[in-house]
Curated annotation (Swiss-Prot):
Induction: Up-regulated in stored tubers 8 hours after wounding and by jasmonate. Down-regulated in growing tubers containing already high levels of LOX1.5 at the time of wounding. The gene is LOX1.6. This is Linoleate 9S-lipoxygenase 6. It comes from Solanum tuberosum (Potato). Monomer. Its main location: cytoplasm.
Length: 857
């Protein structure tokens, strides 16, 4: 009777058994992945962790007519489950009292009165009478209750639109969103779950001198930017508008909402890769101390030694101290004998088959279609190419390339005929660089703005025609530029000059890739979507369930980037040519960012490399048929769109249902007005008034987070791990006749080339970085996969997701088939590197393939 009274009524009480899967705090310690989980901490948990079910059908007048709570149930014995659990997880039994009136539980409250936090993965009620199994996907850290201002609540895996939420659960749904939003004040702590916005005012460190001051990005017309996650750290002493920074040694502790932090396997992999790369970086440095030219590679053999010979492990007290300080798990990883030992970098794909094919014109051009930055090339639509820069400020910036420069290489066509036949293309790095070039060249960088013209040959490959290199006029910006045009040559010093011209282009493309294609267009633009989704869409919302996997680890990797990569004096500034102007440049480029244009078909049409064509499979027809990124990308895009269409159509049948969804409307409003607030007045934002607008927007969000990021990230080491192929910096200008540099170029062209591009120190640092960024961690979740098979209770979306997975498997087979087709010369090229960057799945490590669900590295 007492129990009956507790849960409402005097009916016979029954027992409902459940299984709780959790992980204790120090099971996640990367130094002890295999640690036993049945230790005293968990033994003590039993009576210190309580669960209370919340009824979705029986109200409690004493609780404001919200769902009735069951009496508390506590963790019981350790269970041996039939399904194997992941490393570090443990299952426990829990038994609830239940009666008929209580009905179906829609949520539960958990209270942790233990001193430690733990990771709660799931609760499954095995057999609720008249209902069967009820599953709660949790995947959340639960801290001691005194850390929270409100109860920790988890909902069952049945999605509901706001208007369809059971009445007794609505207040819980609303309150949980209020908790996640916070009140916009205070410094965030490790246990907080609050999602909020801030500008990029934390890149500089003005307290450490003028050289460490950086412009705030976001919140101004001059430097607009997507918002980042708010940490609430106090301002710097010298500038109240700049946020103070945490010490480098505490970088891993930078605030992100607790459940956004890397999981234990990822953190272990990440730290191991970082340590491994650092050691690889340090050892050649020690070696270079005994070299006559310590910051120079003297020959290409010198560069190749990084991958082939390696350096013998030094013995002695220093090495012993180093190994003693490294945890055992890490030592096993560092000293593996599978060709990736600590003493050398893995051989990048671009030089695996041939050590020299990267230098060919064909490979130079092919990488614009199938390399790590295949999203810049566009069709030439006016000749000579014109600039869009303001002539009042920058004078005449139009190209000086003439028909005489290129017509002898157009297979008998005139320039007009070649353009009309869609045969001329351009890699244009002129307008984006000119406003900053004068300042960039005051640093150790010495480089040019560039335009590269290419001709589409009958065999489907591209041929470089001319490279224009431009410098700001010495008398001032308003006088325009001084330009010089270079054309291909394979004879004598002209051949060496042509190789250098291509290197300057590669430097530009490398910087634009890292700052724009990679950081801005994937990492930075997606973070506001992560924040808004958690603030405005309940975990019960179907669109939250759709998008959630595509936000995994993004806030954490971006926070770490702000701490050690893109900050003043960080690794990015140290390794890319724009140096301290890098992030400011990306803000200027963000002015032209258009959300609907991030959709792959729209992007291809905008760049002129495709035309709209309703009779083509994906609604567009490629003008370069053998364009590996676009061909594979359109297949992936269509698969994502088909899946999103099936999913959204299940929940929304009319415009009215979209318009009356208050969470969805609040989400979209906040994204436009706050998350991407510097662009809130742009006319191109979808209104979010129709199911089609929702489908298109969600498809684009998923595309950016998954396939676009994979295409521009995981090819970094395969193509740029060998720095001569994609140098990040140029240190001197093109040699002029009559100078010692020109004589050196004639006598020792390789040495002159290496003295022009990235120096040894920068190379080692840059290669170390991109090796880390190009690796998949062992716990990666790929497109078409989910963390839990129980992510939703709705059968139709589950079936649609299964169909999506099968479609991606078919696409993998097609990619393998295309890569084996010798007619498609751009698929592998002279370096024999098959295009696999949009191959959906991968194993862990440095694979050059695989599309993770999210921007997770």
């Amino acid at each position: 009777q007492i129990v009956g009274g507790l849960i409402g009524g005097h009916h016979d009480s029954k027992k409902v058994k459940g299984t709780v899967v959790m992980m204790k705090k120090n099971a996640l310690d990367f130094t002890d992945l295999a640690g036993s989980l049945t230790d005293k901490i968990f033994e003590a948990l039993g009576q210190k962790v309580s669960f209370q079910l919340i009824s979705s059908v029986q109200s409690d007048p004493a609780n404001g007519l919200q769902g009735k709570h069951s009496n508390p149930a506590y963790l019981e014995n350790f269970l041996f489950t039939l399904t194997p659990l992941a490393a570090g997880e443990t299952a426990f039994g829990v038994t609830f009292d239940w009666n008929e009136e209580f009905g179906v539980p829609g949520a539960f409250i958990i209270k942790n009165t233990h001193i430690n936090e733990f990771f709660l993965k799931s609760l499954t009620l095995e057999d609720v009478p008249n209902h069967g199994k009820v599953h709660f996907v949790c995947n959340s850290w639960v801290y001691p209750s005194f850390r929270y201002k409100s109860d920790r609540i988890f909902f069952a895996n049945q999605p509901y639109l706001p208007s369809e939420t059971p009445e007794l659960l609505r207040k819980y749904r609303e309150n949980e969103l209020l908790t996640l939003r916070g009140d916009g004040t205070g410094k965030r702590e490790a246990w907080d779950r609050i999602y909020d916005y801030d500008v990029y005012n934390d890149l500089g460190n003005p307290d450490q001198g003028e050289q460490n001051v950086r412009t705030t990005l976001g919140g101004s017309a001059d430097y607009p930017y997507p918002r980042r996650g708010r940490t609430g750290r106090p301002p710097t002493r010298t500038d109240p508008k700049s946020e103070s920074r945490i010490p480098l040694i505490l970088s891993l502790d930078i605030y992100v909402p607790r459940d956004e932090r890397f999981g234990h396997l990822k953190m272990s992999d990440f730290l191991t890769y970082a340590l491994k790369s650092i050691v690889q970086f340090i050892l050649p440095e020690l070696h270079a101390l005994f070299d006559g030219t310590p910051n120079e590679f003297d020959s290409f053999e010198d560069v190749l030694r990084l991958y082939e010979g390696g350096i013998k492990l030094p013995q002695g007290p220093l090495f012993k101290a180093l190994t003693a300080a490294i945890p055992l798990e890490m030592m096993k990883e560092l000293l593996r004998t599978d060709g990736e030992g600590i003493l050398r970098f893995p051989t990048p794909l671009v030089i695996k088959d041939s050590k020299t094919a990267w230098r060919t014109d064909e490979e130079f051009a092919r990488e614009m279609l199938a390399g790590v930055n295949p999203i810049i090339i566009s069709r030439l639509q006016e000749f000579p190419p014109k600039s869009k820069l303001d002539p009042e400020a920058y004078g005449n910036q139009n190209s000086t390339i003439t028909a005489e420069h290129i017509e002898d290489k157009l297979d008998g066509l005139t320039v007009d005929e070649a353009m009309n036949n869609n045969k001329l293309f351009i890699l244009n790095h002129h307008d984006v660089l000119i406003p900053y070039l004068r300042r960039i060249n005051t640093t150790t960088t010495k480089t040019y703005a560039s335009r590269t013209l290419l001709f589409l040959q009958d065999n489907g490959s591209l041929k470089p025609l001319a490279i224009e290199l431009s410098l700001p006029h010495p008398d001032g910006d308003q006088f325009g530029v001084i330009s010089k045009v270079y054309t291909p040559s394979d004879q004598g010093v002209e051949s060496s000059i042509w190789q250098l011209a291509k290197a300057y282009v590669a430097v530009n493309d490398s910087g634009v890739h890292q700052l724009i294609s990679h950081w801005l267009n994937t990492h930075a633009v997606i973070e506001p979507f992560v924040i808004a989704t958690n603030r405005q869409l309940s975990v019960l919302h179907p669109i939250h369930k759709l998008l959630y996997p595509h936000f995994r680890d993004t806030m954490n990797i971006n926070a770490m980037a702000r701490q050690i990569l893109i900050n003043a004096g960080g690794v990015l500034e140290s390794t890319v040519f724009p140096s301290k102007f890098a992030m400011e440049m990306s803000a200027v480029v963000y002015k032209d960012w258009v959300f609907p244009d991030q959709a792959l078909p729209a992007d291809l049409v905008k760049r002129g490399v495709a035309v709209e064509d309703s009779s083509s499979p994906h609604g567009v027809r490629l003008l370069i048929e053998d364009y590996p990124y676009a061909v594979d990308g359109l297949e992936i895009w269509s698969a994502i769109k088909s899946w999103v269409t099936d999913y959204c159509s299940f929940y929304y049948g009319s415009d009215e249902e979209i318009l009356k969804d208050n969470e969805l409307q609040a989400w979209w409003k906040e994204l436009r007005e706050v998350g991407h607030g510097d662009k809130k007045n742009e006319p191109w934002w979808p209104e979010m008034e129709t199911p089609q607008e929702l489908i298109d927007s969600c498809t684009t969000i998923i595309w950016i987070a998954s396939a676009l990021h994979a295409a521009v990230n995981f090819g970094q080491y395969p193509y740029a791990g060998y720095l001569p192929n994609r140098p990040t910096v140029s240190r001197r200008f093109m040699p002029e006749p009559g100078t010692p540099e020109y004589e050196e170029l004639k006598k020792n062209p390789d040495k002159a080339f290496l003295k022009t591009i990235t120096a040894q120190l920068q190379t080692l640092l840059g290669v170390s970085l991109i090796e880390i960024l190009s690796r998949h961690t062992t716990d990666e979740i790929y497109l078409g996969q989910r963390e839990s098979p129980e992510w939703t209770k709705d059968k139709e979306p589950l079936a649609a997701f299964d169909k999506f997975g099968k479609k991606l498997t078919d696409i993998e087979k097609q990619i393998i088939q295309r890569n084996g087709d010798n007619i498609l010369t751009n698929r592998s090229g002279p370096v024999n590197a098959p295009y696999t960057l949009l191959f959906p799945t991968s194993e862990g490590g440095l694979t050059g393939k695989g599309i993770p669900n999210s921007v997770s590295i």
